[in-house]
């Protein structure tokens, strides 16, 4: 097949007839086509190392060009940052027992942007045991939140038992919420969902619950309190 780019009399005739594009236009088309092919090639390479693990990037780094290696290094750093963020986010998952001497390190210096939930309790108080049980479940559900517990008097000397259970919510060492005493928790009927909702109101955890699970009971109580006062019957008046 004759080369359409060749400077021949026949090609000149074809160009004049409009059968072949002008020579300059043809060159531009070729350059555009070459650029597209290069872009597709680069995208293919990018897709290749986007799908690779950090270990695979290390194994295959000799196969890439200098330009590819710069892009790969950017992806490697991005992957590493994502991995570290995931490890940090999921590094808890259980309730840690501390004493007073651990307070500064575990609470005040817990870390930037980190939520800490501290339960002050004592053995032998049933509601404290119930809350510890619920917190264990919530710690597994929200591994990015630091859940800790401590016997009350090891953190606060002479802390009165009547204030137990007590839950403090911290962020970056500052108290964001506090729940003190059995009445705040509603007694032994407290469910894990109710505790989750209560803690979510402080901002410490991001619950998927759409409404307070205790609300229907509260509405029922309120409706009974707000209900109409029954009218006295005439017979009641006569009996007085």
UniProtKB/Swiss-Prot annotation:
Post-translational modification: N-terminal methionine acetylation destabilizes the protein.
InterPro entries recorded: Phosducin-like_chap/apop_reg, Phosducin_thioredoxin-like_dom, Thioredoxin-like_sf
Family label: Belongs to the phosducin family.
One Gene Ontology MF term: protein folding chaperone
Record-annotated Phosducin domain positions: 27-181
Taxon lineage: Eukaryota, Metazoa, Chordata, Craniata, Vertebrata
Record keyword Phosphoprotein present: yes
Listed Pfam families: Phosducin
Quaternary structure and partners: Interacts (via thioredoxin fold region) with KDR/VEGFR2 (via juxtamembrane domain). Forms ternary complexes with the chaperonin CCT complex and actin substrate, leading to inhibition of actin folding. Interacts with XIAP (via BIR 3 and RING domain). Interacts with HSP90AA1 and HSP90AB1.
NCBIfam families: phd_fam (TIGR01552)
Expression induction: By hypoxia and heat shock.
Main subcellular location: cytoplasm
Chain spans, region Thioredoxin fold: 92-240
Signal peptide as annotated in the record: none
Modified residues annotated as Phosphoserine in this record: 44, 65, 235, 237
Gene coding for it: Pdcl3
Record's protein name: Phosducin-like protein 3
Expression across tissues: Expressed in blood vessels (at protein level).
């Amino acid at each position: 097949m004759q080369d359409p780019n060749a400077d021949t009399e026949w090609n000149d005739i074809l160009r004049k007839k409009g059968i072949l594009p002008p020579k300059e236009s043809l060159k531009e088309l070729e350059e555009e086509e070459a650029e597209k092919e290069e872009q597709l090639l680069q995208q293919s390479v990018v897709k290749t190392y986007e799908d690779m693990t950090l270990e695979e990037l290390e194994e295959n780094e000799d196969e890439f060009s200098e330009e590819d290696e710069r892009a790969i290094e950017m992806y490697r750093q991005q992957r590493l940052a994502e991995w570290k963020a995931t490890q940090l986010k999921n590094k808890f998952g259980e309730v840690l027992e501390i004493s007073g001497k651990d307070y500064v390190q575990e609470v005040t210096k817990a870390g930037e942007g980190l939520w800490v939930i501290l339960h002050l309790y004592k053995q032998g108080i049933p509601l404290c045991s119930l809350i510890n049980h619920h917190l264990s479940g919530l710690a597994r559900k929200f591994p990015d939140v630091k859940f800790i517990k401590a016997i009350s008097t090891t953190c606060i000397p002479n802390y009165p038992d009547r204030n137990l259970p007590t839950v403090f919510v911290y962020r970056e060492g500052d108290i964001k919420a506090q729940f003190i005493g059995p009445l705040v928790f509603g007694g032994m009927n407290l469910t894990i969902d109710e505790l989750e909702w209560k803690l979510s109101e402080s901002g410490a955890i991001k619950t998927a619950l759409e409404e307070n699970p205790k609300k229907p009971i509260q509405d029922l109580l309120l409706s009974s309190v707000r209900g109409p006062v029954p009218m006295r019957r005439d017979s009641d008046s006569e009996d007085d």
